[in-house]
Design a protein with these regions (language model features):
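Active-site phosphate-binding strand-loop segment of PLP-dependent enzymes
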Residues: 111-193, 201, 343
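PLP-dependent aminotransferase class I/II
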Residues: 8, 37-42, 47-54, 60, ...
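Helix C-cap/helix->beta junction micro-motif
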Residues: 99, 152-153, 305
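Phosphate-binding glycine-rich loop
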Residues: 30, 35-81, 95-99, 105
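Hydrophobic/aromatic ligand-binding patch that stacks against planar heteroaromatic rings
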Residues: 95-96, 149, 190, 237
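Conserved PLP-anchoring active-site segment centered on the Schiff-base-forming lysine
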Residues: 67-124, 130
């Protein structure tokens, strides 16, 4: 069986270094807010290309903390609007509504799966305060047009970079393109921890300091609480593991890209819509999305032939029960993607033999 993702193999790539890093933390006797967290945040900020990195508990917390900090800074208030792609994972929307802000859903492009920048400006109202782009599946969502819209309308640009660690737009990495970016280190991500973890990167010192306080119960000094905060911290074990894996991220992404280009070049089946070659060259391929009108049939066929797949995602946010107030929105492109998308295995641990098997099966379908 070719598993969709075998995390044990991902960890084993650098197993001895990871074990040494974990043991170093165990031996230190310091498990929160210590030297590993500080070092990782410095190293990750340098990698991304920002002045600041603040570790936190997970990617959802990172998004939520950014918006909460903007409210504490007086830049946003209850009822303000955040423009966001309609075809994202629900965490993106949860962060907005948890802050009593309104998500304004914008359709994606079918060829890139990213927010359609030609549809953004028509969604802006007097209450719009930010555009939140999502580098979905590992592909950069930023465009010069989006940057120009933010400047002309005085909007904050927030990046959800949970799925695109290491991706670039020109010479700049995602996570450094906007005012702030949220990162997830969920184990399955390109840069994954051995548990939950997250971070915010930004060049805004006031924002970074506010987020750091909010993530530490609202405290910037011990036992002094400036805000009604939360407990959301990146622990020392996860920070130590991430320091090891960060050193290999570019190489891992290069292997992912090599496999993706093989898929794009060699899968020749008119029943399948694959990402373009240009897409494949630009993405870090957290997910390799294939569109197929017979998606469920394709998934069953692959499983019967020993290949696991996943769907990202079967139900879009506006069709979820928790957001029934959005259910009447007309979002046909989003719904097409969610009805047809199938993610085939793509990660740096796949062998060439496994890649050949996947290509062969998809060509025979």
């Amino acid at each position: 069986m070719i598993k969709y993702l075998e995390l044990k193999l991902v960890t084993a790539q650098h197993g001895s270094e990871i074990s040494e890093a974990v043991q170093r933390v165990v031996d230190s006797g310091w498990y929160l807010q210590g030297t590993e967290n500080k070092a990782f945040c410095e190293e990750f900020a340098s990698f991304i290309g920002t002045a600041h990195c603040v570790g936190c508990g997970n990617g959802l917390d990172a998004l939520t903390l950014i918006l909460r900090a903007y409210k504490e800074m007086g830049i946003m208030e209850d009822g303000d609007e955040v423009i966001v792609p309609a075809n994202t994972y629900i965490a993106t929307i949860l962060a907005i509504t948890e802050n009593n802000l309104k998500p304004v859903l914008v359709e994606p492009r079918i060829d890139t799966f990213q927010i359609d920048d030609t549809r953004i400006e028509e969604a802006i109202t007097p209450r719009t305060r930010a555009i939140m782009i999502v580098h979905l599946y590992g592909k950069c969502a930023y465009t010069d047009r989006i940057g120009d819209i933010c400047r002309r309308h005085n909007l904050r640009l927030i990046e959800d970079n949970a799925q695109a660690h290491g991706c670039k737009y020109g010479n700049r990495r995602t996570g450094s393109l906007g005012n702030a970016a949220a990162h997830s280190f969920y184990p399955g991500k390109n840069l994954g921890a051995l548990g939950d973890g997250g971070a915010v990167t930004t060049n805004d010192t006031e924002l970074a300091e506010t987020i750091a306080a909010l993530a530490n119960y609202g405290s910037s000094r011990k036992y002094v609480f400036d805000y009604k905060g939360r407990n959301s911290r990146l622990d020392e074990v996860q920070a130590a593991v991430l320091r090891v894996k960060l050193r290999y991220l570019d190489a891992d992404n290069s292997r992912r890209r090599n496999i993706a280009l093989q898929y794009a070049e060699r899968i020749q089946n008119k029943r399948l819509q694959l990402p373009s070659m240009e897409y494949c060259k630009q993405s870090v391929h957290h997910i390799f999305p294939v569109l197929c009108k017979q998606r469920d049939e394709l998934q069953k066929y692959l499983l019967e032939n020993g290949v696991q797949t996943q769907v990202h995602y079967p139900i879009p946010p506006h069709r979820q029960l928790c957001y029934k107030e959005m259910a009447e929105q007309k979002l046909p492109i989003t719904e097409q993607i969610h009805a047809e998308e199938l993610s085939i295995p793509l990660n740096q641990t796949l062998t060439q033999e496994e890649v050949e098997t996947i290509i062969g099966l998809l060509n025979k379908f």
